[in-house]
Amino acid sequence: MEVFGKSKAHIVLDSRFHESGIYFADYEKLIMCNPYCSNVKYLKDLDIFQWIFQVADPRSNPIIAVFFVRQHEENFSLDDGYGKAFADARLKNRAPYNGKGKRIRWEAVHDHPEFEKTTPNTFVGKASTEICLLHQHDGKTSVYFDTDICLDFEISFPLSLMPEGILKFMTETIMSQIMQQATESMLCKVQSDICCSVPELIVEGGKK
């Protein structure tokens, strides 16, 4: 059974655009701010990262989720094709921004190494994140997070007795709650690491 989770977040940092870009490009430092992340490994030969997350199910049994991602970085302008699409989707007002942006993507890797599953509750999923930094006229930096994950669970007894639609809805709701908590925790860590203004923070979770 495939389940999906989504989260969105926005924060305004007092730090300059260049310094903010360096901070958010530090992949391992940033992802380890996630309270559910137990390990990050860089597979140099493949130029990909392996995430391992661990959460507890309603019965306090550990569930291990493994993701393989590749990081990409690129600069953009709010006047180019990507920038216009981003502004239409995420910005209510373009006035605060000078048009300069940086995009950091964690792209799901489909052709990845085999992962040895040590427990039946270990699942290899797909995750993708887009972090967009926008330079404001006042020198501050707006940061937008968008994260999507997908896990394919094997349903065991007695859960297999439940209608799949109901079970899928319940699982995606729980997954979204976990993603909200993780995003909020990461942003709190960012706030403690670099000087922030009172943040404009929106965190949303939901199924695909």
Residue ranges, per PLM feature:
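Short, surface-exposed, polar/charged, turn-prone segments marking secondary-structure boundaries
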Residues: 69-71, 78-81, 133-135, 171-177
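Domain-wide signal for the mature, well-folded portions of proteins, strongly enriched
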Residues: 32-37, 124-127, 149-151, 159, ...
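Extended interaction regions within the primary functional domain
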Residues: 66-101, 195-207
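A conserved amphipathic terminal alpha-helix motif
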Residues: 161-208
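Beta-strand/loop substructures that line and gate deep hydrophobic ligand-binding cavities in soluble
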Residues: 84-173
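Short C-terminal domain-edge/linker segments immediately following a structured domain
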Residues: 42-43, 81-86, 137, 174-183
